[in-house]
Amino acid sequence: MSDSLHTHKPEADHDHDHDHSHKLQPVQKHEHGGHGDSCCSAKVAAPSLIKLSETTTAGARLSNFRIDAMDCPTEQTLIENKLGKLVGVQQLEFNLINRVLGVTHDLPSTAPIIDAIKSLGMQAEPLEQGAELPAPAPEKKPWWPLALSGVGALVAEVIHFTNAAPNWVVAVIALISILSGGLGTYKKGWIALKNLNLNINALMSIAVTGAILIGQWPEAAMVMFLFTVAELIEAKSLDRARNAIGGLMQMTPEQATVQQADGSWVLQPVKAIELGARVRVRPGERIGLDGEVVSGSSTIDQAPITGESLPVEKTIGDKVFAGTINQSGSLEYSVTAAANNSTLARIIHAVEQAQGARAPTQRFVDSFSKIYTPAVFILALAVAVIPPLFMGAVWFDWIYRALVLLVVACPCALVISTPVTIVSGLAAAARKGILVKGGVYLEGGYKLDYLALDKTGTITHGKPVQTDYLSLDPTADASAPAIAAALAGRSDHPVSLAIATAAVDKQFAPLIVDNFEALAGRGVRGEINGQVYHLGNHRLVEELNLCSPALEEKLFALEKQGKSVVLLLDKSGPLALFAVADTVKESSREAIQQLYELGIKTLMLTGDNVHTAQAIAAQVGIDEAKGDLLPTDKLQAIDALYARGHNVGMVGDGINDAPALARAEIGFAMAAAGTDTAIETADVALMDDDLRKIPTFIRLSRQTSSILKQNIALALVIKAIFLGVTFAGIATMWMAVFADMGVSLLVVFNGLRLLRK
């Protein structure tokens, strides 16, 4: 009957913001146009929060800016480097999904920030604090410049190959092709070079310019055209990954039917509906806002929130969620959350935040990129200069080889594949009702080989009922049930609720409880009419030195039946005994079997007695069960598994079992829908109470890890091959672009496969 709160791991345990001290903020609908930027940057996996100074000054304030051109780590790196040099800027927070930049600064105005961003070729629009974010305007580019570029590049190649016209004609056609398709790349490349940033735009601009200078006009045109096409396809693919989560938000209707003061019903925009308003929903309609049913009954498809395949019965007092579908009957509900603070909105916001946290593979890519790109650039310079100067080689041949090296100098495939794969995995999990709070958990789930589980509400339904009552003191026979009910009514533990509920029909006179105190892992204590009473488990009785062999025998008999026993005591001894039983969820048996098939061992940790723990564990097939545990005992059990070399996950309700959940590699919270605490604090929040979602998560984690490894291997092999054939003088520039961008698209599409899981 503990009432502990779920506090979480320190930030040092994982490379992301693990304190979760912030509250989830409202979310707005958003959509992305095909912003044609390549995401090649050494800092693609950087966290969204960048601290430029150790502490913020007393006068620091937060200014938010919408930057429509900022939807890729390429722009993030440029902005970070530029604003990092601006005196007074202390912290940057990038939201690439919504294209919003938060700047913590102590500048007198935001003009220097806006000017600095403008110098990078981007426009920063200041946003009012708390204002709703406007959706990014889809960027509509005319198709004819790209078509002209492609036709020009092809014609230049054909004329050059057949000698059908003079070289100056080829040069003119190629120049038209380059200018029509590559001006944007040149502009971005120049800005990057001015800021000493070797991103893909800078490298491609240098390579194309070099090809022009040595007279390779047709190849320069073809390289620029292929790069522009690949970049466009890549941007569309990235948008698909970004919009996978945002698409959920479109499930909420724009309007809902609201009861007016005169009793009439009027359609109103959901954003304008106030808390407490009475909303009507007919069969087949989507529910527009979170609320509580006040009239009617129906079945509701909750798949957008919980991933449940079967509709759920709803009646008066039940919660309903925005975005879910009313199926059979009419309902009226009272609004409990604003449109931008619904459970669905908070889920989407949490996943968007999770996209900024670095997974282990992203950290590897980050480190690799910082070394690889400058190294290949220096190698290209050496290749262009050393053989002609010191080995008598032909300048043209080796400059050309150096230009080919520049094309493969940016690890685009590596850089792009990791975030696309992680975002796709996060979206796939969210659609199944599994809220993963970062790539570090999505990728780390495949390592788990041991899962510790709480009992009540996790393996069992968490809705126990009182099955037995036994008076232990004839003098208190009349008063004991009422006293127990009064104490139990002050606790929110399921066992206490069962005792309190059983007393409702008996209509006891209400008793006032003074000096009430919850005793973690043992029970509760309170004063009634000046007398101190305890209501608790076997451990509490022993602590009070009020146990006896006769009482032990009674407890043992009930515990062997899988029942939890609670005793009412005063200073003289036990007054009454209450036995409570919970039922095992059928889904728990299936989940444990699936975990067994995945090679994951299971351990049940519960504050309930050992006999009940073993009985429940035997029913569902759990490998090992430990009972009579305090929260600190559960922590020690997790530590013991770590000491044996296991990677451990812990499943609880997101509120109790705080130390164990915090210590585990991944903390899973059950039934998080409608529970703010669980959504905010869990590493992985299951939106309903179906334990089968954990093996589903582990399978998804293994698939994600496999795809990440496939992508890294493919990208590195292609890079190695092209470095080899470049030195052999076989590779051409357009072949390098085709291969480099081709493998980038392959790994992106491979990552997007997770959206179909």
What do the PLM-derived regions correspond to, one by one?
Residues W143-L154, R363-G392, R401, L405-P411, ...:
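Bilayer-spanning, highly hydrophobic alpha-helical transmembrane segments
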Residues D115-A137, W143, A174-Q259, E274-R282, ...:
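Actuator/coupling domain of P-type ATPases
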Residues M1-W168, A244, D262-L267, E274, ...:
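Flexible metal-binding regulatory segments at protein termini and peripheral loops
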Residues I159-H160, T324, D449-D492, R522-L603, ...:
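ATP-driven catalytic headpiece of P-type ATPases
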Residues G530, G562-S564, D570-Q710:
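Conserved ATP-binding TGD loop and adjacent catalytic N/P-domain core of P-type ATPases
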Residues V158-P166, Y186-G189, K194, I206, ...:
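Membrane-embedded alpha-helical bundles of multi-pass transporters
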